Amino acid sequence: MRGLRRDHVRLMVVDRARRKITHSRFDRIGGFLRDRDLLVVNSSRTLPAALPATRADGTTIQIRPCVRRPGHWDALAVEPEPPFANVALRAGETLRIGQVMTARVAGRRPDIPLLWRLEVSRDGLAEMEALGEPIRYSYVPQPVALDFYQNVYAGRAGSAEMPSAGRPFSHQLLGSLRGSGVGTAEILLHTGLSSFQDDAFDAEHHLYEEWFEIDATAAAAINQAPRVVAVGTTVVRALESAAAADGKIHPVLDWTSLAIRAGTPIRAVDALITGLHEPTASHLDLLRAFVAEPLLMRAYEDAIENRYLWHEFGDSMLIV
């Protein structure tokens, strides 16, 4: 995307104990990790989740599923081209997706009214494979191949958008880190949408549920690790949802609606690798649980001054 190897993006290291900010490159992250650190990654694979749908009058819109359950989706309806403006649907109308799939509009989701409750005739995975494309926003002006939205360790497909904190890891870098004593464990959390395509609405930081899984092998590795380094806020949400009062992780398959904000006790995660997002994004709510406000704002001022890039193809931050 940027003419760089994925592990050559910039890396900002925020040391909370020393209140120090260091600028580096992602492939040098091993210099800031320790022997026996455990990287916990989200192995969910990104779906080509942006689907064309046809209304009864023949117009085409795009459906972006946020929460997928058997028989129904909570989804955004937008115009099919940038800037992907929201489209108002009518309760009772039926959308056609491909040749055989239909989606009947039941109405708006009460707690997140920009999402539409769709009663779907199929799970939509075949339609995504045949017709879908990765969800993108106006800062990505042209369609991008799905491979660019995948982490190298991605496994089972299910995320509406890429768990992007892991994108800078290459196979070579992961191998080098393992050789220096840094371990890895995989959990799974299927992401929803990062934006509802309405700045004022996004600023209200509406929360929705996401499906996550932590198996016994991952739970044991996490519980034994001297330092747990979460690769992404999705991993933080999963681990903190699964953590008992003493911080121990138990195997789980469940939905989580956990909100993590300033003052939320962090019981299972010791350090965090994350992408950079605009200072108004809900992403920063979670970071405030890790980093005191003055240091976090200084880090973001540094990022702006040094022209760090935002979003899923941008630069990275390590909080230790």
Protein language model features and the residues they cover:
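A cross-family signal for N-terminal binding/gating loops and helix N-caps
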Residues: 1-320
